[in-house]
Amino acid sequence: MSERKSNSKAKNTAKKAVKKAYKKNPKAFIIGAIALVLVIAISVAVIYFAFPETWDSIMAMITTNNGGDPDDNGGSNGDSLERGDGELQIHFIDVGQGDCILILFPDGKEMLIDSANYNDDGEIEKRTLDYLDTYITDDQIDYLMVTHGDSDHTYFVNEVIEAYDVDTIYMPFILAEPSNETLQAQVNALEKSKLDMFTDKDTISTKVYAEFFISALSEPDATIVLNIGQFSIETATYRFDFYCYAQEDWANTNLSSAEKKNAISPIGVLEYNGKRIVLTGDSNEINEPMFIEAVGGTGLDCDVLKVGHHGSETSSTREFLDFINCEYAVISCNAEGNTFLHPRQNTLDRLRADNMTLYRTDLHGTVVLVVDANGTLTFTTEKTTTADIWMGADTAQNQG
């Protein structure tokens, strides 16, 4: 049970005890209550007049905690959000082995996180762009994020930027240095003030990252935000908190392995009407503990997890799952013919041990999550399946 749920249970127990005491002896209960109020009032008066500095410290503490329990880790002042009267939609688009997440916020804004298929499949690309056109009807995207430089997250992004006007682009703190001379010349021709933002020593030499990089920095009037530290997209009714590598983490990291390249993925927590959705990119055992440390407390009671790195064995660690305490999981993957053998059996077993409800794009197609005005979660899937959703790609191959 999470700390938040434990606190709630404790409060309910206390309420029951008060009611029981009142029923047993109403007169004594009332006299005792009045006496307690008088004692508290006298104590407050003494502190206020005799110890003004102590009073100021107490008031500052109350203001800082926003009246809440600092150990009840509800995110960034989670209780301060107003209830929204619209729908939040999150579309986990089936792109095979890759990621593409379209978020439709209740205020009419949109966000796209990654857009790619590992094999740069032209048919999947067209289908994905057609899908986006169905929901983005004003030729404009408010927020676009690329979590990291892998091709199965970036292949279609330059086409998206060409097709839509993008207001804000969130991207890795990594300079493109393509081996292709023509592309390198295009990188060199980009606005110097934008290129100067990329001071980290790491670079990416792939063609696909260079094409995205050039498109992003060439997008007219787009604000470029680097995935560094913590930042939020916030309104009165929803908040999207992102936890990324801090500046010193970037400085102390070299992208010498696939695991290190994946670990730069931001972990985002989107909250609306009392529900929290965790989006992870290809996060893994390297940056998941960093997220836990950054959030702090004993846990962050969440509802839905987009499983990191397509269900890789090194993602969704036991510690991470215990910390976020989700009831639902979504995996974007293509188990059939997938040389990476994602999702892995060990990862699925960890999710199953938590009694999660699981959705997989390889079996269910595109998965759409809706949080409505009442805070109710609903999932719809493109297709149904009779396959064993808890069988990993590695297990299926072994049974082959």
Predicted regions and their residues:
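Gram-positive cell-envelope targeting signals
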Residues: 1-79, 169, 369
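Long, structured stretches of catalytic cores involved in phosphate-ester chemistry, encompassing
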Residues: 184, 296-366
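Surface-exposed intrinsically disordered loops and tails
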Residues: 181-225, 249-254, 290
